[in-house]
Amino acid sequence: MNIQEQGFPLDLGASFTEDAPRPPVPGEEGELVSTDPRPASYSFCSGKGVGIKGETSTATPRRSDLDLGYEPEGSASPTPPYLKWAESLHSLLDDQDGISLFRTFLKQEGCADLLDFWFACTGFRKLEPCDSNEEKRLKLARAIYRKYILDNNGIVSRQTKPATKSFIKGCIMKQLIDPAMFDQAQTEIQATMEENTYPSFLKSDIYLEYTRTGSESPKVCSDQSSGSGTGKGISGYLPTLNEDEEWKCDQDMDEDDGRDAAPPGRLPQKLLLETAAPRVSSSRRYSEGREFRYGSWREPVNPYYVNAGYALAPATSANDSEQQSLSSDADTLSLTDSSVDGIPPYRIRKQHRREMQESVQVNGRVPLPHIPRTYRVPKEVRVEPQKFAEELIHRLEAVQRTREAEEKLEERLKRVRMEEEGEDGDPSSGPPGPCHKLPPAPAWHHFPPRCVDMGCAGLRDAHEENPESILDEHVQRVLRTPGRQSPGPGHRSPDSGHVAKMPVALGGAASGHGKHVPKSGAKLDAAGLHHHRHVHHHVHHSTARPKEQVEAEATRRAQSSFAWGLEPHSHGARSRGYSESVGAAPNASDGLAHSGKVGVACKRNAKKAESGKSASTEVPGASEDAEKNQKIMQWIIEGEKEISRHRRTGHGSSGTRKPQPHENSRPLSLEHPWAGPQLRTSVQPSHLFIQDPTMPPHPAPNPLTQLEEARRRLEEEEKRASRAPSKQRYVQEVMRRGRACVRPACAPVLHVVPAVSDMELSETETRSQRKVGGGSAQPCDSIVVAYYFCGEPIPYRTLVRGRAVTLGQFKELLTKKGSYRYYFKKVSDEFDCGVVFEEVREDEAVLPVFEEKIIGKVEKVD
């Protein structure tokens, strides 16, 4: 091996003179200039051999045997040697430049001994075995063994097998020197390089940089020597000159002398930060087969130097040039001495275009200087933390209050909806609405007149509150008086004008809340107004009249004012004197006070009303107590009779009785189910304390407790309905009868859903069954069987004798025989729908019955 050391090229910038030779003419870079002591170009040649071939160039090799002295454009050019290095390890080790580059890589990796040992073994094997070389061969074998194998910490010793090391040691100890004694060790080291170091070298930056620059890598120039590259050096360029400095010939002499330790193309220390952005670029590596090519184009280390004959253009110019090349497919890389006009012949067109696109992407990211814009206030204006916190807390509290109000309103509306939904099934619940704040017009005459004033004042105070309090009072009043009649057909809250007129014309205000009042309602209002005036007339002028005379006259006038046209009743309105003498108990005025505010207003107005009274208060006697007890007992007995009558005939829930021509409202039996034929001559109110003001009212229940109880009962009813079909029919019957009741516009809203007893329901079912049996002439011991055959929309219906039908009997009904699957409908609470189709497979199994029928589906088995 003839390897000569190569020094670092001289920097022409340090000793530049006017007599220095000019740069070579484009196309003549490969010519050897004998007068210049320094080489005109620096590159590794691809020649194989030991001698120096300085007159050739790997970029454009000069061939003297051609007519023009070089290859014309369009002619074929040999594959560059650095691409052959990727074929195999032997191709790499057969080239001197490849060996030098590979050794540089191994030095960086700390395993250069592998390559040295491989060449040492090759040289030892080439020594001729003769007597004169015997001693030399022994010394060389011992030197190789001591340097590479004896040291167990060395890379070669670690990669060599123990048996191989023992064999080599035995040969040296016995002095049996054989040319092939290191062949096994060389083979093992070569295998190690092929598996590890050689693939790593092909993927290393040093090899990729070498291929990118066209075999002109600065790293190779500065780190190693090559026999084929001696005598060559990089062309001298002026040193890097800053923008604000002036170049001098003798500047930085010491720095230039010390640049042997660094590549000539490396940036000075002071320019590292200035050129950081252009030097940072990402390199992607591609491999196609055995060929390894470089990734996206990267700017050279020093942007002020010309690299491989290509001058760098500004960023905008480079972008425009690349875009023009991609758009027009023009050739913008033209050189005077190139085989294919600047495009390497070993690249296919597709790869070249892809590389150009990658270059455009990289050049498009050139950092631009900051351009100051017009100053404007930023969007996020800084605010003082304390002021910002106060503003934020204020807004959040407003949002929280809004949400809480919405939640409360929704909760109350939900309660009202629950009451409305439970109105059909719960006889104790009354219809919701603002009209529940006052009892019906005729019922007011059973209160003392001061209670009338108190009720109006309480209503006025209640309507002056916010809507939430109105809604609360409405819910509480509905729960406390579930059976009370609504004041009128209107469901709109009275405005201030209506409220102001209430004490004057109570009957009209009580029944005339809506804009459009029917004629019957007008009659009722007029009657109520007339009767109201009659009461006040007795207040001021007839306090000294006897009680019996007052009662008789009040009864007579109440008959004329009663809008339902019933017979005269015995519990009509009474004079103020009698009302106060009978109903002066402390709890009498509290009967109307359903809420706290109304109660306070009642007490306040009661004191005002008592100031100008001249009537004497009397304590009720024994006859009045007996009369009261008799009324209570009679009311209870009549209620029981009415319930038994409902069970026998169902008259109270049928709603089929036609009213008389002069009746403008629903029958009394529908409004008050407990009112029997004997009691239809008297108006029986819903509560006992209205019948007799001396009776204390019931304690007001807790609304939340009532709601919880209603919800619990509804849940229990749903559970029982899902478990027992009879219970479900019970609830459905109740809801149906509640909806079937006719509600004319002029009549009060129904308070109580007519009761449906189990006995009545069973009687209804029995009658329906008898009716069906009589219509179809179905025998009692037969059952209807209906089935859908193979997805047909219309079922088949037939009669089967017996109540228990098995699957075998059902199969005999089918006209088509085959393999089928049978499903039958049955009641089940397993799913929400309440029914399922159950498959039956055994012929002896009894088919389920659904609503007195057997309903089945026959599906064909595929």
UniProtKB/Swiss-Prot annotation:
Residues modified as Phosphoserine are 75, 77, 217, 469, 486, 493, 511, 581
The principal localisation class reads cytoplasm
> What are the boundaries of the region Disordered?
1-78, 215-289, 316-344, 413-441, 480-500, 531-629, 641-679
**Per the record, where are the segments of Low complexity compositional bias?**
325-339
Query: Can you quote a single GO CC term?
Result: cytoplasm
Motif annotated as Tankyrase-binding motif, chain positions: 20-29
Specify where the region named Interaction with HIPK2 lies, as residue ranges. Answer: 677-752
Residues covered by region (Interaction with SIAH1 and SIAH2): 353-411
- UniProt region (Interaction with CTNNB1), positions on chain: 434-502
Q: Record keywords: Nucleus included?
A: yes
Q: Which residue intervals define the domain DIX in the entry?
A: 780-862
Protein's UniProt keywords contain Cell membrane: yes
| Cross-link Glycyl lysine isopeptide (Lys-Gly) (interchain with G-Cter in SUMO): residue positions | 857, 860
Q: Which GO terms describe its molecular function?
A: armadillo repeat domain binding; beta-catenin binding; enzyme binding; I-SMAD binding; identical protein binding; molecular adaptor activity; p53 binding; protein homodimerization activity
Q: Name one GO biological process term.
A: negative regulation of gene expression
Which ranges are annotated Acidic residues under compositional bias?
242-258
What name does this protein carry? Axin-1
Q: Which organism is it from?
A: Homo sapiens (Human)
> Could you tell me the gene encoding this protein?
AXIN1
